Amino acid sequence: MNAPLNSAVRLDSIEEAIADIAAGKAVVVVDNEDRENEGDLIFAAELATPELVAFMVRYSSGYICVPLLPEDCKRLNLPPMMGRNEDVRGTAYTVTVDANTGTTGISATSRAETMLRLADPMSVVDDFTRPGHVVPLAARPNGVLERDGHTEAAIDLARLAGLRPAGVLCEIVSEEDPTTMARSEELRRFSDEHDLKMISIEQLIEWRRHNETQVRRTVETQLPTDFGSFTALGYKHEIDGQEHVALIAGGVEELNGAEDVFVRVHSECLTGDVFHSRRCDCGQQLHQSMEIIQEAGQGIIIYLRGHEGRGIGLLAKLKAYSLQDSGLDTVDANLEQGLPEDAREYSVAGQILRDLGIKSANLLTNNPHKGEGLRGFGVEASAHTPVEIEPNADNIDYLRTKRDRMNHDLPQVARWDAAHALK
């Protein structure tokens, strides 16, 4: 049985993969074990050669696809293969095609010609016959940041290599067991044997988040609050449309180049922030952070939308509460729904801090690992300042779980337990 893909398998850098794509080579791209758990050979369609296609056919399923942007599918009149897409992964297969200059259409030479035509911005509908032996795929316009599939990875790699956004892909078959697909260590051995770079879609997602800007500052205004006056900056994510807010104390311009700035990265919590729920300490942490920042005279509150329930959404969080009422803890209540323990990611916060220009942050958080992802955005987490909120009878179990299973720094839990053990 093939081992699943995991972090123990050595991966190459995204920069190396981009360089090889630009040089006309293929790379191996793997996805998550919870998805297809497969590796695809991928190269740029505009650099297709009979030799590349023959290599791909030899080591793959042979069902070769060419991801294209939706506008190219429309330009070439490539409608969906089916009116209703029932593919479990949502892969957008279109009608199959051959270049009209080929012979049988199935040879490596003929398929390479079809790929070149599909990648050519000057090609037209009549350059192809239908049906054929090459399967175009309609990729999501925003690549792996919109859908974490090989289709989008192929488009992104070609674009990042400075080439037309059109790729070629096919799943690699196991040589150890040709009845199944290659996975994990076998993909690494295959890559090394053939001098190919191997990367993951997860790597590509993180690379794009760190090296591109998806959030834009759209508005600035003054916001007087019960805790003092802040400058409110509105940010909008250009891909998912989510709107986020940064509250600034001490002036926006003064943050550029500033060090050891108090920063609270706060995840949206309707129940805690607005309804003052006693099941969590979110609203109290937010308010205490605003007080700390006002007392310091400088600081940033980043309010991240879309983080409700550690990223699982409001209704799923309410369902998790119901499961907790039945005896599960906050972690298992998520897992019981088939949801991750914590679905949040903080690239938006990193991009906002990069936009503001601070050099280092004193993070107001009880999570000692929260600053690990900021370094990639040019911000050092120079210190962590706990935000200690005294427990109550309704949230003590929740806080114990955060301490014991999520490694949060919560000394107040021990104080509560000691005090109540004496009663």
Swiss-Prot record:
This is Riboflavin biosynthesis protein RibBA. One of its GO terms (biological process) is riboflavin biosynthetic process. Zn(2+) binds at C269, C280, C282. Residues 211-423 are annotated as: GTP cyclohydrolase II. Pathway: Cofactor biosynthesis; riboflavin biosynthesis; 2-hydroxy-3-oxobutyl phosphate from D-ribulose 5-phosphate: step 1/1; Cofactor biosynthesis; riboflavin biosynthesis; 5-amino-6-(D-ribitylamino)uracil from GTP: step 1/4. It catalyses: D-ribulose 5-phosphate = (2S)-2-hydroxy-3-oxobutyl phosphate + formate + H(+); GTP + 4 H2O = 2,5-diamino-6-hydroxy-4-(5-phosphoribosylamino)-pyrimidine + formate + 2 phosphate + 3 H(+). GO terms for molecular function: 3,4-dihydroxy-2-butanone-4-phosphate synthase activity; GTP binding; GTP cyclohydrolase II activity; magnesium ion binding; manganese ion binding; zinc ion binding. The keyword Cell cycle does not apply. It comes from Corynebacterium ammoniagenes (Brevibacterium ammoniagenes). Its EC number is 4.1.99.12, 3.5.4.25. SUPFAM superfamilies: RibA-like, YrdC/RibB. Mg(2+) 2 binds at E36, H150. The gene is ribBA. D-ribulose 5-phosphate binds at R35, E36, D40, R147, D148, G149, H150, T151, E171. Binds 2 divalent metal cations per subunit. Magnesium or manganese. Residues 1-210 are annotated as: DHBP synthase.
